[in-house]
Amino acid sequence: MKFLSKIPLFIFALFFVAPIFASAATTFEVSGWVPYWNGATSTADAIAHITELTEVDPFVYAVQNDGTIKDLGPMDQAPWSTLVATAQANHVRVIPTIMWSNPSAEESVLSTASSRRALEIAAANIAKQYDGVDIDFENKPADLRKYFSLFLQGLYERVGTKLVTCDIEARTPIGDMYPDGNIPAGTGDYANDYTQINKYCDRVHIMTYDQQTVDQALANQAASSSQLYAPVADPQWVSRVVQLTEQSISPKKISVGVPTYGYEYDVTAYSGNQYNYDIMWTFNPKYATQIEQQYNVQPTRNAADELELTYIPTTATTSMPVSSNINNALIAAAAASQYATQLNSHMDFRLLDWPDATSVADKAQLAKQLGVRGIAIFKIDGGEDPNMWSAIQGLASSATTGSLGGGGSISSSSLQRDLSIGMSGSDVAVLQKILNSDSSTQVAASGPGSKGNETTKFGAATKLAVEKFQSKYGIASASNPAYGFVGPATRAKLNAILATL
């Protein structure tokens, strides 16, 4: 911790309390941003579920073009003051976010020593009113790398014992961004210096969402099997991002960003199951429910562990689509693709892709498997899947739900059906038990899914473990559509191992 360097050594020897720091290192944290633009519902949602959080991040402060900070709450008035009081009463940290996303203003303020110091002081004064401060400066030019690091250093030295949290971009491995090897000049030039962030940030929130097409390796893999692929955050991508980040930033500081919103796309289908995606807007899950009802369609869980549905609106508009008379026996994507292929033409349809409670819970389990400190939810405002809270609570307090018991042998017949992400059942628990019998394919090191704590749910961590199993035994690789899917070949090998347990 940064304040230790400010305490004389003899005082430190007298007053150092080891259990506090040991506890902090072993706690899995669940934090969440509470946005100002829905202040009443956001704060009410956070207050109602405050005991399920270890930290709230009121998303209320914004840096202005002149480098001053504006309080958009205001934080000292209801409902924000009520949120703060409730959090403090329940021993939940309050770390307000200071946001900024104006490249020219960031360049002007941060590159000038006097204005940079003034911003450090203003941010530190906010931190001292709470448990710390969260810095969310986005879209900075790469040439601000040195100056932003100087800002973090100055802030870190000014806040005393308070925490400095940094929100940083999700870096996709360059080879996955450009699998064809044609890497544009300047790729890999970032304004955030991860080494300095590791030094001057006590917590680091990785913004692992808004993936879209950044991971071309995964997009190409989906396209090769004619799958729709426009995820908010594919667990495979999240895993790659976190593993890359952990090369520079301590896992004990990292929280994985978890989205609660989705995207609607206007998709054009071309001959041969080829698709072009144009983002229309973001939405909360309630909107998807409305579309389900209007068009009599049902969502399915996709390979990215998110829900998706397709439909063809009667009239293309820039507002919410109206009801359609399309034959609902046809899935819109399949109908559009069939039309485009038969006529060697193209056809448009809509795609909704969004995370639900299962997606959020699986991200938490993945974060545990990756060995990071916790998850950071964006956003808490009453618009998320209402089942999210019980899903998170279940992960935290019901580690033995669906368990096969601690370390005993498996009393079960062989695996009889194909298994994939999103499925559940006692055979999933058997699958996890087999995978956990080998340390190189274990589902999780601790918590739900770990040895002795197997569950009945096939989530992102189970899928990653299946991939490791398939790679180990040469059954499938990342370029194979069956990667992470328990089909006949994988099941045969699993059953052979099961017979020996």
Model-derived segments and their meaning:
Residues 56, 135, 204, 256, ...:
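Conserved, mostly hydrophobic/aromatic
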Residues 99, 401-456, 461, 499-501:
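Acidic, Ser/Thr/Pro/Gly-enriched interdomain connector segments
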Residues 394, 455-464, 468-501:
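Extracellular LysM carbohydrate-binding repeats and other cell-envelope/extracellular binding modules
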Residues 36-50, 110-127, 184-195, 355-368:
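Short, acidic/polar
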Residues 25-122:
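Glycan-recognition patch characteristic of GH18 chitinases/ENGases
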Residues 359-404:
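Acidic/aromatic/glycine-rich contiguous surface patches that form carbohydrate-binding/processing clefts
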Residues 253, 260-365, 395-396:
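Glycan-binding loop/region signatures in secreted carbohydrate-active enzymes
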Residues 68-78, 140-290:
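Substrate-binding surface in catalytic domains of secreted glycosidases
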